[in-house]
UniProtKB/Swiss-Prot annotation:
Gene that this sequence comes from: ubiG
Organism of derivation: Thiobacillus denitrificans (strain ATCC 25259 / T1)
The protein's name: Ubiquinone biosynthesis O-methyltransferase
Disulfide-bonded cysteines: none
Biological role: O-methyltransferase that catalyzes the 2 O-methylation steps in the ubiquinone biosynthetic pathway.
Top-level taxon in the UniProt lineage: Bacteria
Similarity comment: family membership: Belongs to the methyltransferase superfamily. UbiG/COQ3 family.
Alphabetized UniProt keyword annotations: Methyltransferase, S-adenosyl-L-methionine, Transferase, Ubiquinone biosynthesis
Keyword Chaperone included in the entry's annotation: no
Catalytic activity: a 3-demethylubiquinol + S-adenosyl-L-methionine = a ubiquinol + S-adenosyl-L-homocysteine + H(+); a 3-(all-trans-polyprenyl)benzene-1,2-diol + S-adenosyl-L-methionine = a 2-methoxy-6-(all-trans-polyprenyl)phenol + S-adenosyl-L-homocysteine + H(+)
GO molecular function: 2-polyprenyl-6-hydroxyphenol methylase activity; 3-demethylubiquinol 3-O-methyltransferase activity; polyprenyldihydroxybenzoate methyltransferase activity
Biological process according to GO: methylation
């Protein structure tokens, strides 16, 4: 439980009731969710698989993965977000097992249980991302997949993800991101390697403010996704 930023938990808990409003502060998550789901599902087909979403928040990705036939669990440290996630299951009719627990504590209790682990838009919000990466590696079965997404750290990502997204375009509330916590792909790849995960693929995610469209492409300067696999 030590690897937690209380201010980050409080920030997202305050907005918890708005998780499932597609026009709220979480609009970007709703818009990128189909891209994230398709990207994961094409690399590690989810139907019939046991999947864990680390830092699941209100359950946007967790529910989507359940919707394509996965048996999904979601963990988070925001009690309010999890309450919203559980309530939304009544509306969607989907089945997800949510639990209030850290990745590290959950890994100690459930080592090697999951075919696929996702950890999306979460690493940049914790004090020790390497600890979360290591926990994800412990949670996945040998040969299983772990998928991450986070923000690169450079001048361009600061201008677009912080200044642009939070202050100019107002896609996100001010203070959503702390630039100092952004993670370069090479840094994340090293964390993964040290945890026993081999990086299989790196993909960028871009946003066009004119067309208001998100795309997956080669540009990893700002947002990126990383597919890793535990050694069999």
């Amino acid at each position: 439980m030590s690897n937690v930023d209380a201010a980050e938990i409080a920030k997202f808990s305050e907005l918890a009731h708005r998780w499932w409003d597609p026009n709220s502060e979480f609009k970007p998550l709703h818009e990128i969710n189909p891209l994230r789901l398709r990207w994961v599902d094409t690399r590690a087909p989810l139907a019939g698989k046991k999947v864990l979403d680390v830092g699941c928040g209100g359950g946007i990705l967790a529910e989507a993965m359940a919707g394509v036939g996965a048996t999904v669990s979601g963990i988070d440290l925001s009690e309010k977000a999890l309450k919203v996630a559980r309530l939304h299951l009544y509306e969607s009719g989907k089945s997800v097992d949510y639990e209030l627990v850290s990745a590290e504590d959950y890994a100690a209790a459930h080592p090697g249980e999951f075919d696929v682990v996702t950890c999306m838009e979460m690493l940049e919000h914790v004090p020790d991302p390497a600890s979360v990466v290591a926990a994800c590696a412990r949670l996945v079965k040998p040969g299983g997949w772990v998928f991450f997404s986070t923000l690169n750290r450079n001048a361009k990502s600061y201008l677009l993800a912080v200044v642009g997204a939070e202050y100019i375009l107002k896609l996100l509330p001010r203070g959503t991101h702390d630039y100092a916590k952004f993670i370069k792909p090479a840094e994340l790849a090293r964390m993964a390697r040290e945890a026993g995960l081999e990086t299989e693929e790196l993909t960028g995610m871009t946003y066009n403010p004119l067309t208001k469209v998100y795309r997956l492409e080669a540009d990893t300067d700002v947002n990126y996704l990383m597919a890793t696999r535990r050694e069999a």
